[in-house]
Amino acid sequence: MDNSAPDSLSRSETAVTYDSPYPLYAMAFSSLRSSSGHRIAVGSFLEDYNNRIDILSFDSDSMTVKPLPNLSFEHPYPPTKLMFSPPSLRRPSSGDLLASSGDFLRLWEINEDSSTVEPISVLNNSKTSEFCAPLTSFDWNDVEPKRLGTCSIDTTCTIWDIEKSVVETQLIAHDKEVHDIAWGEARVFASVSADGSVRIFDLRDKEHSTIIYESPQPDTPLLRLAWNKQDLRYMATILMDSNKVVILDIRSPTMPVAELERHQASVNAIAWAPQSCKHICSGGDDTQALIWELPTVAGPNGIDPMSVYSAGSEINQLQWSSSQPDWIGIAFANKMQLLRV
């Protein structure tokens, strides 16, 4: 980055960098615009009980990111995922609702007017108070925003009604740890697991699931899942220690429609464009964030990315802002970088 600016910030024409005091992993964009700009939440990744969530304010006109110190708060263990409530969630207060996963699913109200963060609920479905199976991820249903699904190392997916703070249903989803979950429709979600499968579930028929993909090598874990919100026929997944992004069409199970193989090391994160059905971004250990445009048919030599961005070190996290679709956020080491696309 060519010039530095105040507030732990450096910027160029197309990127803004925020330097955190600690390594970062979880990250989320708010769909609400506040008086100070667009809010971004980032979570620390410290091998310790005491971790933090910081709320940042991003002004795209002035290309500045500022921490909001009054809205920084402690979090038990590193949050495995952060999400702000979808815009479809109607709430009486003007504050933002933020969800985090780790030991439990937690809901927080971020109120910038009063500079407060209020813990709203801690949701735990464990029958024994001494034990909790860590949550690896969760997804907020934007069609039915009272519904939030979590996944855990104990092979289950749990669907919560967050308005009533009760479990709607809990399913044994896989044979091994469940690593990620994504909603497609109001009652349909999918998950990926260390057992190497992508499975789709319908809450109207809980006894059955559809396996739409399995790792080519048995038991190669699948780490992440992204469902294309602009075209629900397509989803993407990544395999452990693999440089591939696998694109699936749920109408033709088992065979990927495309495999994106231009990363030089393992892929860690994927995100579909919020405003286009054809674009997806991936980030990996090769320090690169690649944006792909998916053609109808891949050529004989595969698909090349339409744009390449190099970060300072391995990219651990990536989010594409739905409220500002010109911006992608990536996290690497102790930095959160916003890229204009």
Curated annotation (Swiss-Prot):
Interacts directly with GL3 and BHLH2. Part of a complex made of GL1, GL3 or BHLH2, and TTG1. Interacts with CCT8. The modification N-acetylmethionine is found at M1. GO terms for molecular function: DNA binding. One of its GO terms (cellular component) is cytoplasm. InterPro entries: DCAF7-like, WD40/YVTN_repeat-like_dom_sf, WD40_repeat_CS, WD40_repeat_dom_sf, WD40_rpt. It comes from Arabidopsis thaliana. Signal peptide: none annotated. This is Protein TRANSPARENT TESTA GLABRA 1. Roots, leaves, stems, meristems, flowers and flower buds. May regulate MYC transcription factors. Involved in epidermal cell fate specification such as trichome and root hair development, seed mucilage production, and anthocyanin biosynthesis by acting at the dihydroflavonol-4-reductase (DFR) step. Together with GL1 and GL3, promotes trichome formation. Activates the transcription of GL2. The keyword S-adenosyl-L-methionine does not apply. WD repeats lie at residues 74-118, 130-170, 173-211, 262-302. Its main location: cytoplasm.
